[in-house]
């Protein structure tokens, strides 16, 4: 019976990997197709001409195919895992550099209570090592917080270098902007409002240029 269970587990793992690969391949194909359309129109008012692969790199990030694993590798500073994404990251950084850097107020909803987190003590500077998705619509962040099922955090970000990708995404209703990996943010306030932790951060620099 144990051998049968082991065999079944292996079969299930193989099936899951195939399904994931199929989903990822479909996401890449969709991103390339959309990237081609965006490149023809030069959407997002880039500071230089953007190529189809550059648009596709941003589209792929918003497709949910890789962002969790990519950000986990970046946050863990796992060189082996990051190396897997090196070619993609190089293209992604090139695409981000082509988009105008904007000074704007953004919000981010997180399904974790950061009020007692020592990193988010007022006066501290935190570094976000992942690619950070934010929104220019506070209601998007609030709706995310409502759906987290417990204590959560709504972060207000006074950004200096955000890239507006609201027209370069599969989810245009989220009014999404991105902060680059290595963004440094100073904690200006941290308070509780009912079950919601409300934090204000001010962008003060970046560790990756």
PLM regions: where:
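Serine/threonine-rich, low-complexity intrinsically disordered segments
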Residues: 16-17, 64
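Internal glycine-rich, Lys/Arg-flanked active-site/core loops of soluble domains
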Residues: 24-168
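Long, compositionally biased low-complexity repeat segments characteristic
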Residues: 2-9
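Hydrophobic/aromatic hotspots within intrinsically disordered, low-complexity regions
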Residues: 6, 14-15
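Short low-polarity hydrophobic stretches
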Residues: 1-2, 107, 137, 187
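Low-complexity intrinsically disordered segments
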Residues: 11-12, 158
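Conserved NAD+-utilizing ADP-ribose enzyme module
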Residues: 1, 15, 21-26, 33, ...
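Intrinsically disordered, low-complexity, compositionally biased regions/tails
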Residues: 9-11, 39, 48, 113, ...
């Amino acid at each position: 019976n144990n051998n049968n269970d082991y065999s079944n587990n292996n079969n299930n793992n193989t099936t899951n990997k195939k399904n994931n690969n199929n989903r990822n391949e479909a996401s890449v194909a969709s991103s390339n197709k959309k990237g081609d359309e965006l490149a023809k129109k030069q959407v997002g008012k880039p500071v230089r001409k953007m190529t189809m692969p550059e648009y596709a790199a941003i589209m792929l990030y918003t497709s949910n195919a890789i962002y969790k694993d990519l950000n986990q590798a970046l946050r863990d500073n796992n060189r082996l895992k990051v190396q897997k994404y090196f070619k993609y990251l190089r293209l992604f950084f090139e695409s981000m550099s082509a988009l105008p850097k904007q000074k704007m107020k953004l919000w981010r909803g997180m399904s974790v209570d950061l009020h007692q987190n020592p990193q988010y003590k007022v006066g501290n500077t935190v570094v976000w090592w992942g690619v950070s998705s934010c929104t220019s619509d506070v209601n998007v962040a609030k709706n995310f917080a409502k759906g987290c099922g417990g204590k959560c955090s709504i972060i207000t970000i006074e950004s200096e270098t955000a890239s507006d990708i609201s027209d370069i995404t599969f989810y245009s209703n989220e009014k999404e902007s991105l902060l680059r990996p290595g963004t440094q943010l100073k904690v200006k306030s941290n308070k509780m409002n009912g079950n919601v932790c409300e934090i204000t951060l001010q962008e003060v620099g970046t560790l990756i240029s």
